[in-house]
Amino acid sequence: QFVTKVVSCRAAELRPEGGGEALSGFQVVLEDTILFPEGGGQPDDRGLIGDVPVLRVTRRGPDAVHFVQQPLQPGAEVLLSLDWNRRFDHMQQHSGQHLITAIAEQMFGFKTTSWELGRQRSVIELDTPSMSTEQVEALERRVNEKIRERVPVTVRELPADDPAIETVRSRGLPGDHVGPVRVVDIEGLDSNMCCGTHVSNLSDLQAIKLLGTEKGKKNKTNLVFLAGNRVLKSIEQSHSTEKALTSLLKNGPGEHVEAVKRLQSSVKLLQKNNLTLLRDVAVLIARDFKSQPDHRQLFVLHR
C-alpha cells in the first residue's frame, strides 16, 4: 500500500481488451504511484485507489494514468493498494524472459526481437528460422541451473548520456522518454534496458518450463514458456487431467495414449459398420417399395 495525492481527474472512456462497448470513467493522475503502466511487453498492474478499482494503467509521457469509474477529487490524499498476485506473476514472467533471452543468445547466438507476456503463457520471438528439440532442452536445463544458483537481479538508473548505456542490451527508448535510463542486471549474465518489474533474485522464479516452439513471422521462431507459479499451476492442471483420464480409461497414466488410440480405432470401425448397415437397410426398403403393386411415383420414409 502507498499514500499519495490526486493531481488530476478527467472524464474518459476505456475500450475493454478484446473489444466490446466502451466503459465510461475517469483518467486519474497521482503524485506518485506503485502501479506499473503497461509497457515493454509487460501488462499493467491492477489495484485500488481507496476502495475504487483501477481497471487500466497506461503511460502518458512521464505520468502513469489510472482509469477508474468513479471521480476522485484533485488534491485529495488517497491510499493506493496493489494486486500483489498479479504483480508477482508478471515479475516472474518478465525476469524469466530476460534470463531466457540472455542464455539463448549466449548458447546459440539467437537474439530476441520481441516478446509477449500472455495471460496463460508467454512467447519470446527469436531471430532464427528454427530451433531443434535438443536446443530447447539444453536451454531449459541451463536457465534452471541459473535459478538454482540464486543469481542476484538488481536495478540501476543511469543518466541518459552515460557511456555505460552503450554496453546495455536495448531495443531503444520511447520517443517521449525523459529522465534517467533504467537498467536491469542479472549478475554476470545480462544488462538490459527495461522499465518493467522484476524479482530480486533468480531463485524467486522457482522454475522455468519451455513448452516448445512455433513458427513465427518473417523467418523467426516463437519460443513458448512458463515461469514460477505458472509452472506449478500447469502441473496441477495436468495432474487433474491425468486423474480424470485414469478414472475414465481404467488404466495407468503410462497407458493413456494407447488406450485412446484403441478407442479411436473402435469408433472408426463402429462408424464404418454403421454406414454399411444403413446402406443395407436402404436397399431393403427400396426393394420393399418396388414390390408393392400400387406404389406411386413419390415415396417418403420418415424415422
Predicted regions, residues:
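Short, hydrophobic/aliphatic alpha-helical segments
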Residues: 14, 19-34, 75-88, 176-191
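Ordered, soluble secondary-structure elements with a strong preference for glycine-centered loop motifs
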Residues: 37-41, 90-95, 130-137, 193, ...
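Short beta-strand-to-loop capping motifs
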Residues: 68-70, 126-130, 225-227, 303
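Functional cores that coordinate and move charged inorganic groups
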Residues: 86, 106-219
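Terminal appendage regions of diverse proteins
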Residues: 205, 211-303
